[in-house]
Amino acid sequence: MTTFSQKPADVVKKWILIDAEGLVVGRLATVIANHLRGKHKPTFTPHVDDGDNVIVINADKVVFTGKKFTDKVYYWHTGHPGGIKERTARQLLEGRFPERVVEKAVERMVPRGPLGRRQMKNLRVYAGAEHPHVAQQPEVLDVAKLNSKNKKVA
């Protein structure tokens, strides 16, 4: 029996809607990354972009476990000498672009390279409950029901 290899022309992409309210960031990012890559499909091929389009709403209402909300630090460098910058998860979630917490978590779970960058373009993250993709008729994926640990309980 020969190994099945998906052809790019045969790829069928669905639209998936995920409500991130109350979900744990890392567990949510894992589910999103698997859907972006297409690993949930039996036709998964590592070198083909056969993942789905994922829409995430309420990204500003995600939660961290333990003390990560106050202690987790995101670093970046400006490119200038002494230009290391840092912000905590709390500062990011309370800042102008709280959706970046989810974007960065997913970005770091997707392969780094041309295919990973193309797959990340299939991710749309919104801080509020509204999204402009109603015409695509996304099907709702309840991440909290997949595993009880996905949703933080008080």
Curated annotation (Swiss-Prot):
Which biological processes are named by the entry's GO terms?
Answer: negative regulation of translation; translation
**What Gene Ontology terms describe where this protein resides (cellular component)?**
cytosolic large ribosomal subunit
Q: Which UniProt keywords apply?
A: Ribonucleoprotein, Ribosomal protein
Tell me the superkingdom of the source: Bacteria
Pfam families in the cross-refs: Ribosomal_L13
Q: GO molecular-function annotation terms?
A: mRNA binding; structural constituent of ribosome
Sorted alphabetically, which SUPFAM superfamilies does this protein's record hold? Ribosomal protein L13
Q: Report the transmembrane regions from the record.
A: none
Q: Does the keyword Cell division apply?
A: no
What the entry lists under HAMAP family is as follows:
Ribosomal_uL13
Family designation: Belongs to the universal ribosomal protein uL13 family.
Q: Kindly state the subunit structure of this protein.
A: Part of the 50S ribosomal subunit.
Q: What does this protein do?
A: This protein is one of the early assembly proteins of the 50S ribosomal subunit, although it is not seen to bind rRNA by itself. It is important during the early stages of 50S assembly.
Which protein are we looking at? Large ribosomal subunit protein uL13
Phylogenetic placement of the source organism: Bacteria, Pseudomonadati, Pseudomonadota, Alphaproteobacteria, Hyphomicrobiales
